[in-house]
Amino acid sequence: MSENELKDDCLFCKIIRGEIPSYTVFENDDVKAFLDISQVTEGHTLLVPKKHLTNIFDYSQADGQRFLQYIPEIAQAIKKSNPAIKGLNIFVNNGEVAGQVVMHSHIHLVPRYSDEDAVSVPHVNNADNYDEARYQRVADSIKDNL
């Protein structure tokens, strides 16, 4: 990626340019992976495209292919780095309403050591609020936009 694809006022663009230090675990022309400063659990890593994309809604198909292909490699390296790791959460917050804080697309890879880690990924079951017609209406609306 070229420097002109980065923004001056973006925290992650500054990290990519080396203006702000990071604990980098992987870097190539497309992505940079570094430890999240918060370390939700030990090894919490961010995978960041070297092209400024605000969130998934800015991705072209080529952006997705170029960036997302590194998830397995980084995830496997995290798992191998510590035998105490039992699992891994991979998540992305897209937009403020979804919890995105830094407006540069990034993927969180959060190692899990036990089911008592301080990580919470809520799962709400709203199936009782859906009948067959509503499921079909939602599915059709998404399908019509592909």
Positions of PLM-derived features:
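HIT superfamily nucleotide-processing domains
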Residues: M1-L146
